[in-house]
């Protein structure tokens, strides 16, 4: 994938860049693998805003992605590489020898016509899914299960890759894209390779309207609100916060850990992810 620069014909295109879609080989999705999903606009089932600054955006068809890779021992061929509006990564359409078609995340280097498979006896090749206990140390993997049979939950975004660092007893140690080091059961499946579309993080939006196409509404700061709306609000003119940074609901912000202190899975985290302040 490459980055396409736009000529500065208007203020909106002056700083704009986008993907060149060079790896995409098919424009229309597989109809049986799509579904229209009503967009929640950041509301819950009572219509109350639970996630601010969301709404609008272009209509999307949801593509059903095979995160479980549960067709074990059946080879598949890559038919096409497609664009998915629901994620930054590209997706690959594969067809198994029994005729079934599925979508999977497209790893870097996987070409149309390549053959992949999943299972304990699958080859150690790009795009194949195997249990962690069958993979050699140092392998780069993505779409990693947290619990056996649940389906991949970690390292699924564009450019994401985790590394298998150790295998000891019933557990395997992984270094995740965030820098976190954690252990998971060796029976958990992972897919070999790095998720494609590496330059997704380097794209410049260019104008506010393009954010609206993505369903993102303007994010206004608390310091410009009224005192009734935010702890940072109020005052005459440009006034400071007058205290420690807080969320709209009065909780401490900027650097405060938000993970539950007694979460059972914390015992599987060997080293926490890196933070902006440098504290793990």
Curated annotation (Swiss-Prot):
| GO BP term (any one) | cytoplasmic translation
Keywords linked to the UniProt accession: Ribonucleoprotein, Ribosomal protein, RNA-binding, rRNA-binding
Report whether RNA-binding shows up as a keyword of the record: yes
Where composition is biased (Basic residues), the residues are 257-280
Q: Which GO terms describe its cellular component?
A: large ribosomal subunit
GO MF term set = RNA binding; rRNA binding; structural constituent of ribosome; transferase activity
Stretches the record annotates as Disordered = 1-25, 230-280
Q: Please, which domain of life does this record's source organism belong to?
A: Bacteria
The free-text function statement in the UniProt record for this protein reads: One of the primary rRNA binding proteins. Required for association of the 30S and 50S subunits to form the 70S ribosome, for tRNA binding and peptide bond formation. It has been suggested to have peptidyltransferase activity; this is somewhat controversial. Makes several contacts with the 16S rRNA in the 70S ribosome.
Entry's PANTHER family?
LARGE RIBOSOMAL SUBUNIT PROTEIN UL2M, RIBOSOMAL PROTEIN L2
* Family that this chain belongs to: Belongs to the universal ribosomal protein uL2 family.
Quaternary data: Part of the 50S ribosomal subunit. Forms a bridge to the 30S subunit in the 70S ribosome.
Q: What is this protein called?
A: Large ribosomal subunit protein uL2
UniProt source species: Gloeobacter violaceus (strain ATCC 29082 / PCC 7421)
């Amino acid at each position: 994938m490459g980055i396409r620069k736009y000529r500065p014909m208007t203020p909106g295109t002056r700083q704009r860049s986008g993907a060149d879609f060079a790896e995409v080989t098919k424009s229309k999705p597989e109809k049986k693998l799509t579904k229209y999903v009503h967009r929640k606009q950041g509301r819950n089932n009572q219509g109350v805003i639970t996630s601010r600054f969301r709404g609008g955006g272009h209509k999307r068809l949801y593509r059903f992605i095979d995160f479980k890779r549960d067709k074990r021992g059946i080879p598949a061929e890559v038919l096409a590489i497609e664009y998915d509006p629901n994620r930054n990564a590209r997706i690959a359409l594969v067809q198994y020898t029994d005729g079934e078609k599925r979508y999977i995340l497209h790893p870097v280097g996987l070409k149309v016509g390549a053959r992949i498979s999943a299972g304990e006896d699958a080859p150690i090749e790009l795009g194949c899914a195997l249990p962690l206990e069958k993979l050699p140390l140092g392998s780069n993997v993505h779409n990693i299960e947290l619990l056996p049979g649940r389906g991949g939950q970690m390292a699924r975004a564009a450019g994401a890759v985790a590394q298998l660092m150790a295998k000891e007893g019933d557990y395997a140690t992984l270094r995740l894209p965030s820098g976190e080091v954690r252990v998971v059961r060796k029976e958990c499946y992972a897919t070999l390779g790095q998720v494609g579309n590496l330059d997704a993080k380097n794209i410049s939006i260019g104008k506010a309207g393009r954010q609206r196409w993505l369903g993102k509404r303007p994010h206004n700061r608390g310091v410009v609100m009224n005192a009734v709306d935010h702890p940072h609000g109020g005052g005459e003119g440009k006034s400071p916060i007058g205290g420690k940074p807080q969320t709209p609901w009065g909780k401490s912000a900027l650097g405060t850990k938000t993970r539950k202190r007694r979460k059972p899975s914390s015992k599987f985290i060997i080293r926490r992810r890196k933070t902006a302040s440098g504290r793990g």
